[in-house]
From Swiss-Prot:
Disordered: annotated segments: 1-89
Coiled-coil segments: none
Entry's localization field: Cytoplasm
Protein name: PopC secretion inhibitor
Cellular component annotations (GO), alphabetically ordered: cytoplasm
Subunit and partners: Interacts with PopC in non-starving cells.
Native organism: Myxococcus xanthus (strain DK1622)
Residue ranges, compositional bias (Basic and acidic residues): 8-28
Amino acid sequence: MNPGSAPWERRTRERMRAMSRKNGEWGDVRVGGVPGLSARVRPLPGAAGADTQPDWIDVTVMPREEPAAASRRRTSPRPPVRSRAEVHQAGLAESAQFHQSLMRWLEAHHLLGAVRSVSEPGSMPMLHLRCAPRVLDQLRRAPEFEAGTMMPLDLI
């Protein structure tokens, strides 16, 4: 038997030829420079185009610390020693409270539609949002939050 002449190999070659005719060859014009999308392929009805969808950015949000609290901390005596479990439970409670306050703030400022995802509360009062740039602008103006963007991995 010749190599490449097995029945399953012939069927595979025939399928590959049929798919290349159906989807176009690599030399076809690509949509938006994206490989694998042919200019002959139409978007689904009702699909939002790239011009109508906001550019999503990754944002880190934390509660803003008051300067007076930092100066009081230097002069105050050392806090009592707590177990790691107590510190962890206190962090979970503080993070959950911060998550609720951020969600209430987003709802009050009518920004929930511009937020794609919000991370779950953890053991630190810090959340990650995937949102439109206007949400970051509003968060930076708010006196109760400290917000900034994350560097994309492709720039590292």
